[in-house]
Amino acid sequence: MLDYSAARLTRFTASWVGNKQRFEGVVIPSRTLIPLHDYAEEVILSAMLKPFEKTEEFFYFHHDEDVSNHQLYQICNTIFHDPETCSDEAGKLAQLLYQCCENPKIQGGEFFLGYFEDLMLHGEPVTAIGLWKVQNRDSYLKTERSQESFTLNVLDGIPAGKLSIAALIFNIDEAEGYRLCAIDTVSKKDERSFWKDEFLRIRPIEDNYFNTRHYIQLAGEFITQKAPFQLGLDRTDTIDLLNRSGDYFKDNEMFEVEDFTQTLFKEEEQQDAFREFREEYTKAYALPLEDKFDISQQAVKKEFKIFKSIIKLDKNFHIYVHGRRDLIERGFDEEKGKKYYKVFYESEE
C-alpha cells in the first residue's frame, strides 16, 4: 500500500503532447517547471497519488537485451540521481511520448511530470516520479458575486480526480528496472496499449498478484472455453465451476495448484485435462507460474468481475447462478419440443 500522508511535491513540469497521426506536434516551453502554491500542491498530490494508493500490481521497465538500454529507464535514473534535471528530462519524455501517440483515439493534451518525496511504499520510504498524460478536458462553471448580481462563466479545465493515463515510478529495484505502477483506461483490454506497451515498455513483476491473476484467468479460460467441448460440460456446469473457483480464491490465503485442481475437479479425467491445459497455457504465454503462493485478494476482486454467472435463455429469461449446482436440473420437453431448466428453492422475494 502507498502512504502519501506526508508526501511533498518538490518539482512539477508541464508540456503539451499532440497526436502524431494528426501532425499536432509537441509544445515544450523554455521553462517547464511550474511554481506551486500550497493548495495546488495538495490538489496535485491527491490527483496523482490517490489512484495508486491501494494498488498491488507492479511492473518493471523492460528491454530485450539489458534494461540499462531502456530510454525511459535512463531518464528516470538521471532524475533520481539528480532531481535538478527534471525540467530537461521532462522535455525528452514528451518527445518520446509523441512518437507513440499515433492511435486516432489519443487526444492531444498536457503532459505532467511530478517529483514526489517522503512517500512510503509497503512501509519503506521512497521517492517517486509521476507521469500524467491528460486525455480529456471538462467544462466548469464559475460564479462571481457582486452587491447587485451574480455572473456566470464557463471555464475549460483539467479534471483533477480522473487519471486515465498515468504512471508512478519508485526509486527502488533499480537493477531490475525500477518498480512502478501504471494506469491506462483509454486502450481496450485486448489491444496493445500505447502507454504501457509502446511508451513505458514494461513487464509485470512475477509476485503474488501476478500469480493470482494468471491462475484465475487460466482457470476461467479452461472452464469456459476448453471444458465444454473436451469434457462435455453444459452452461450450468461451467457456471458452477466458475463459482467454486471463485470460492477457492476468496476463502483461502494460500494457493496450491494440486489442492486447487482436486478441490475444483472431482473426476480424474477433469483433473488430468486441467493439468494438461495448464502446461499448454504457461508455454503459450511464457508464464513462469508458481505452484504455491499467497493469494492476492485485490487480484481476486479485480479478475472475478469479468466472469458472468448468467444463463441466458433466448431473449426472455436470464438465470443468475451463485452456487448449488445440485438445485438446478436441465432437460428437454418432448411435447413442447423445447429445452428447460428446473430450479429448486425454499423462498422467494
Report residues per predicted region:
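Long, hydrophobic alpha/beta structural blocks
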Residues: 1-303
